[in-house]
């Protein structure tokens, strides 16, 4: 590992990398049109009025417009039934104009999210949450890869560092980030340890890591002084403080002088998750729905 003693970390600019990815996707959509090929289509389903979900969904629709995808919006009332949603998903599964189906989580409590996610056809599961796609990743033959881990791999590539053989520590074991992230890093040749907020001697694990990915949803969980000199720090956390400021799961100010590379919050991982959703939708259109 490069030693960055008494230096400040290189910032990994997720915003800029995501913008460049969106530009490439938009260019490809234009080329497809010129070749007389279909425009990629994404269907976004939102159930209820959760304000955070509404913001995320509006971002995703705006992203679709920006790259020239056709986006279909389904804003459904909170009391929508499991059966009505199942029927909608079936209809979208059968619609040849739809390459990706996105079901915005969390869903109202009376709905079974697992059953609904499994109802989405694996070749239209652009979030990469279907057990089939997670299984493909586990078996080292990924098809549609979960967006946040996939975006993080793109950020890691941008550092130019060779990940092969690195000690990687993931803090947080969720289905959406931690677990698939572990599989992505195994695939990249890392030695992977998965921790969580109740891990004994979390500081010790973090201190041995050449690469730390923190996705625990707990502000300030990982202290800057735990970070090994020169390590790569990827902070997936996004927590709003009482003063309205967004902070990650890592104490940024104290990690900055120790890390070799670090993602800011906001402007690090978040934009990449959104860009990878578009990348997956394009991939589905180009490779899976020829």
UniProtKB/Swiss-Prot annotation:
Please report a single Pfam family linked to this protein.
Answer: THF_DHG_CYH_C
Q: Which Gene3D superfamilies match?
A: Leucine Dehydrogenase, chain A, domain 1, NAD(P)-binding Rossmann-like Domain
Biological process terms from the Gene Ontology for this record are: L-histidine biosynthetic process; methionine biosynthetic process; purine nucleotide biosynthetic process; tetrahydrofolate interconversion
The protein's matches in InterPro entries, at most eight in alphabetical order, are given as:
Aminoacid_DH-like_N_sf (IPR046346), NAD(P)-bd_dom_sf (IPR036291), THF_DH/CycHdrlase (IPR000672), THF_DH/CycHdrlase_cat_dom (IPR020630), THF_DH/CycHdrlase_NAD-bd_dom (IPR020631)
Q: Which UniProt keywords apply?
A: Amino-acid biosynthesis, Histidine biosynthesis, Hydrolase, Methionine biosynthesis, Multifunctional enzyme, NADP, One-carbon metabolism, Oxidoreductase, Purine biosynthesis
Cysteine pairings via disulfide bonds: none
Query: In what pathway does it function?
Result: One-carbon metabolism; tetrahydrofolate interconversion
Presence of the UniProt keyword Ion transport in the record: no
Which GO terms of the cellular component aspect does the record hold?
A: cytosol
Its UniProt entry gives the catalysed reaction(s) as:
(6R)-5,10-methylene-5,6,7,8-tetrahydrofolate + NADP(+) = (6R)-5,10-methenyltetrahydrofolate + NADPH; (6R)-5,10-methenyltetrahydrofolate + H2O = (6R)-10-formyltetrahydrofolate + H(+)
- The UniProt annotation places NADP(+) binding at 172-174, 238
| Its EC number(s) | 1.5.1.5, 3.5.4.9
Please give the Gene Ontology molecular function terms for this protein: methenyltetrahydrofolate cyclohydrolase activity; methylenetetrahydrofolate dehydrogenase (NADP+) activity
Q: What does this protein do?
A: Catalyzes the oxidation of 5,10-methylenetetrahydrofolate to 5,10-methenyltetrahydrofolate and then the hydrolysis of 5,10-methenyltetrahydrofolate to 10-formyltetrahydrofolate.
Q: Which NCBIfam families match?
A: PRK10792.1 (NF008058), PRK14186.1 (NF010783)
State the oligomer form and interacting partners.
Answer: Homodimer.
Family under the similarity heading: Belongs to the tetrahydrofolate dehydrogenase/cyclohydrolase family.
Q: What is this protein called?
A: Bifunctional protein FolD 1
């Amino acid at each position: 590992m490069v030693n960055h003693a008494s230096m400040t970390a290189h910032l990994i600019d997720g915003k800029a990398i995501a913008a460049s990815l969106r530009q490439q996707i938009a260019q490809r959509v234009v080329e497809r049109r010129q070749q007389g090929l279909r425009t990629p289509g994404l269907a976004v389903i939102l159930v209820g009025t959760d304000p955070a979900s509404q913001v995320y969904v509006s971002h995703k629709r705006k992203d679709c417009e920006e790259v020239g995808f056709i986006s279909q919006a389904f804003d459904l009332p909170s009391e929508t039934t499991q059966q009505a949603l199942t029927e909608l998903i079936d209809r979208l599964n059968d619609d040849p104009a739809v390459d990706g189906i996105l079901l915005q989580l969390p869903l109202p409590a009376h709905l079974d999210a697992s059953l609904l996610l499994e109802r989405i056809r694996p070749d239209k599961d652009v979030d990469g949450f279907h057990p089939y796609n997670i299984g493909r990743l586990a078996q080292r033959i990924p098809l549609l890869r979960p967006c946040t881990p996939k975006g993080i791999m793109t950020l890691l590539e941008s550092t130019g560092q060779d990940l092969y053989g690195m000690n990687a520590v993931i803090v947080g074991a969720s289905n959406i980030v931690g677990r698939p992230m572990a599989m992505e890093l195994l695939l990249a040749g890392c030695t992977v340890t998965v921790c969580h907020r109740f891990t004994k001697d979390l500081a010790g694990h973090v201190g041995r890591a050449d690469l730390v990915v923190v996705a625990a949803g707990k502000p300030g969980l990982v202290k800057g002084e735990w970070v090994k000199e020169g390590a790569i720090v990827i902070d997936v956390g996004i927590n709003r403080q009482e003063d309205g400021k967004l902070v990650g799961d890592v104490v940024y100010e104290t990690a900055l002088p120790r890390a070799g590379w670090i993602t800011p919050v906001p402007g690090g991982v978040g934009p990449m998750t959104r860009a990878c959703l578009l990348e997956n939708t394009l991939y589905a259109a180009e490779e899976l729905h020829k």
